């Protein structure tokens, strides 16, 4: 049986108590609608005055975690008043212009219906009406509050209406008090296996109880503490598709975390386990989005962690670093191995014109003792500089191939590559024709190919050609990939290698438009291929 409070001249809402006559032509009845969590809004664009919605955590070695927090598109379809409402107890409060509580109804919804006796009799005036579901606490002193345990289910509706004395219906839109957060991982390469992470806020300022001001319709922390969500598993995106520009993984269970509104959140995400990504361990790494976030009630937030790779470059003065710190320096080469201290030129040599390797390979070749087998493991140290610039790197022990534009054009044009700027770094080697080691390093450490034992005898191997393209173009370079939109999927670009195999002839790097690479070979002395220079720093 519903209690009815009739507002009188006093401030006591219990001045008159009884059940209203449902046939009366006076009084206020109520209807409820229950919308889902709100629609998407990128933080910093609408209501939140953020200067920056993205924060970056440096994981080292050029791996960055770009963390953003945005409002997501939710199901904004509002349940019509005639649709089934959530069963339970509802409390309706009426406050006058001075903020005094004038009336209160405790009503129960069964099978989606309010009792016809749930009517409030009020004197003509303007009132603030507030409706609470049974997950909202109302103290004897009139304090409205919600605990963290009820963040997912507590709802409050509020509206201001003028009562004239005739029968009227006041509609409530019952919004969620809490907000929900889901986490998504994004990367330029496949999300690896065994990735687990959890969100938390250990600042000590997370609301564990939130108080609601019915007059202003605002929330404030009633009690604060810490928050720790459950560990979530992020499925791998696989290991066979290398063609996408981005790979996304979201947990299949525990999709949402529910929190109370917060004017200054410091939510973070910590990886608790996971295989390597970009050759970097994830476990133990913590990602922090933009601090002091305003988390609003009834909102759906996406905490997106974008794991990106930025590369180091060799600059004109011989220094090495990231583009973000380049200042007035000019990049001339992309670092492919910090172990071998090697880098690849940003553009093709010889203005992109193909040439032969040497005119007579029997005469102008590498030393016979230095011919590897196509099945040999590719060495960690490149011989390219030696074969290009040392007389001892030639078969006859006399010829310096770097100085022979007619006899050894591939070596010559690599050795005389012009990066377009004056190079002043005294620590830099001369430019050279890259060997199999250099091309393998490009495949593994820039293209993030997965065959760590790749050699000239290997079958074609895929790499992340979008990452390759970005690494070159970010620095104003020309990618080694085939970007011709009219080319067929098996169209390729061929680059010379400085390596000559005893059972495979001259090495080539085949780069197919479909994202595959292949350490191939050239048999004919008339074969033409492109030239890309390399350098040591």
Per-region residue spans from a language model:
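An exposed tryptophan-centered "aromatic clamp" motif
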Residues: 411-430, 436-513, 536
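Residues that flank catalytic or metal-binding motifs in active/ligand-binding sites
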Residues: 88, 177-179, 340, 429, ...
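Short consensus segments that form the blades of beta-propeller domains
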Residues: 78-84, 422-425, 522-524
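Short aromatic-cysteine micro-motif
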Residues: 336-432, 436-449
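GGW-centered surface loops in extracellular recognition modules
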Residues: 295-352
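Short, structured beta-strand segments at or near domain termini in extracellular proteins/domains
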Residues: 494-496, 519-537
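Sec-type signal peptide cleavage vicinity
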Residues: 5-311, 359, 364-390
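Residues within well-ordered beta-strands of beta-sheet-rich folds
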Residues: 130-132, 182-184, 343-345, 430-432, ...
């Amino acid at each position: 049986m519903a209690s009815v409070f009739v507002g009188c001249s006093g401030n006591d809402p219990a001045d008159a108590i009884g059940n209203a006559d449902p046939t009366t032509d006076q009084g206020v009845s109520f209807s409820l609608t229950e919308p889902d969590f709100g629609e998407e809004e990128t933080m910093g664009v609408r209501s939140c005055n953020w200067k920056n919605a993205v924060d970056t955590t440096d994981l080292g070695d050029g791996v960055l975690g770009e963390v953003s927090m945005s409002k997501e598109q939710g199901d904004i379809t509002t349940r019509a008043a005639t649709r089934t409402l959530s069963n339970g107890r509802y409390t309706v409060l009426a406050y006058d212009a001075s903020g005094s509580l004038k009336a209160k109804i405790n009503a129960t919804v069964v099978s989606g219906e309010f009792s016809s006796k749930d009517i409030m009799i009020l004197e003509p005036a303007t009132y603030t009406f507030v409706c609470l579901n049974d997950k909202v606490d109302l103290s004897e002193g009139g304090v409205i509050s919600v605990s963290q345990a009820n963040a997912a289910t507590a709802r409050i509706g509020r509206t201001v209406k003028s009562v004239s004395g005739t029968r009227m219906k006041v509609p409530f839109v019952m919004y969620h008090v809490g907000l929900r957060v889901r986490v998504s991982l994004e990367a330029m390469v496949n999300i690896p296996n065994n990735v687990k992470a959890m969100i938390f806020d250990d600042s000590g300022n997370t609301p564990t109880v939130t108080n609601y001001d019915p007059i202003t319709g605002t929330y404030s922390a009633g009690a604060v503490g810490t928050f720790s969500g459950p560990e979530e598993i992020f499925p791998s995106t696989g290991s066979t598709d290398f063609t996408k520009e981005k790979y996304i993984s979201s947990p299949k269970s525990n999709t949402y975390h529910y929190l109370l509104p917060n004017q200054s959140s410091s939510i973070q995400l910590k990886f608790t386990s996971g295989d390597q990504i970009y050759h970097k361990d994830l476990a133990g790494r913590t990602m922090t989005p933009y601090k002091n976030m305003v988390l609003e009630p009834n909102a759906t937030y996406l905490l997106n962690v974008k794991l990106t790779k930025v590369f180091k470059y060799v600059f004109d003065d011989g220094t090495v670093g990231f583009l973000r710190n380049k200042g007035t320096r000019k990049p001339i080469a992309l670092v492919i191995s910090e172990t071998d201290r090697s880098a690849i030129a940003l553009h093709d040599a010889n203005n992109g014109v193909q040439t032969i390797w040497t005119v007579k390979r029997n005469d102008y070749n590498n030393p016979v003792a230095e011919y590897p087998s196509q099945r040999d493991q590719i060495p960690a140290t490149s011989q390219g500089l030696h074969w290009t610039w040392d007389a001892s790197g030639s078969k006859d022990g006399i010829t310096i191939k770097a100085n022979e534009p007619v006899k050894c054009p591939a070596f010559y044009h690599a050795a005389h590559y012009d990066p377009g700027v004056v190079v002043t770094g005294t620590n830099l080697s001369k430019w050279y024709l890259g060997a199999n080691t250099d091309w393998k390093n490009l495949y593994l450490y820039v293209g993030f190919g997965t065959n760590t034992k790749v050699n000239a005898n290997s079958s074609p191997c895929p790499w992340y050609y979008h990452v390759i393209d970005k690494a070159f173009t970010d620095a104003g370079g020309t990618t080694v990939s085939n970007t011709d939109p009219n080319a067929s999927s098996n169209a390729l670009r061929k680059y010379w290698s400085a390596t000559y195999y005893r059972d495979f002839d001259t090495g080539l790097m085949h780069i197919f438009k479909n994202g595959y690479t292949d350490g191939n070979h050239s048999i004919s002395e008339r074969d033409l291929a492109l030239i890309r220079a390399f350098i040591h720093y």
